[in-house]
Amino acid sequence: MATDLNIDHVANLARLALTPEEKATFAQQLGDVLHHIEQLAKVDVAGVEPTAHAFAVTNVWADDAPQPGLSVEAALKNAPAQREHMVVVPKVVE
């Protein structure tokens, strides 16, 4: 079973304030998840080639041909605020 320390740590990382009842519930659930992971660790994968996807993934490239774009007026038509042909947005970085 997951320890209270693990539950407190995970709750802190997720910025959650848990009641003792919630901690007990989540400790049981986390313990169940860890048990399933232990079961997966026991699976014999000798001779199995590692993969990132169940099926082969290939990129399909389209020709990079220039195409007409939007006019400035069309691009800014729905912008809530604009200045000098640019969209004005709130500052997000100090």
From Swiss-Prot:
Swiss-Prot/TrEMBL catalytic activity: L-glutamyl-tRNA(Gln) + L-glutamine + ATP + H2O = L-glutaminyl-tRNA(Gln) + L-glutamate + ADP + phosphate + H(+); L-aspartyl-tRNA(Asn) + L-glutamine + ATP + H2O = L-asparaginyl-tRNA(Asn) + L-glutamate + ADP + phosphate + 2 H(+)
Gene3D superfamilies on file: Glu-tRNAGln amidotransferase C subunit, N-terminal domain
Name of the coding gene: gatC
Disulfide cross-links: none
PANTHER family xrefs: GLUTAMYL-TRNA(GLN) AMIDOTRANSFERASE SUBUNIT C, MITOCHONDRIAL
Protein name: Aspartyl/glutamyl-tRNA(Asn/Gln) amidotransferase subunit C
Keyword Protein biosynthesis found: yes
Superkingdom of source: Bacteria
Protein's organism: Opitutus terrae (strain DSM 11246 / JCM 15787 / PB90-1)
Role: Allows the formation of correctly charged Asn-tRNA(Asn) or Gln-tRNA(Gln) through the transamidation of misacylated Asp-tRNA(Asn) or Glu-tRNA(Gln) in organisms which lack either or both of asparaginyl-tRNA or glutaminyl-tRNA synthetases. The reaction takes place in the presence of glutamine and ATP through an activated phospho-Asp-tRNA(Asn) or phospho-Glu-tRNA(Gln).
Entry keywords, A to Z: ATP-binding, Ligase, Nucleotide-binding, Protein biosynthesis
EC number annotated for this UniProt entry: 6.3.5.-
Complexes and interactors: Heterotrimer of A, B and C subunits.
GO BP annotations, alphabetical order: glutaminyl-tRNAGln biosynthesis via transamidation; regulation of translational fidelity; translation
This protein's record includes keyword ATP-binding: yes
Listed InterPro entries: Asp/Glu-ADT_sf_sub_c, GatC
GO molecular function per UniProt: asparaginyl-tRNA synthase (glutamine-hydrolyzing) activity; ATP binding; glutaminyl-tRNA synthase (glutamine-hydrolyzing) activity
Sequence similarity: Belongs to the GatC family.
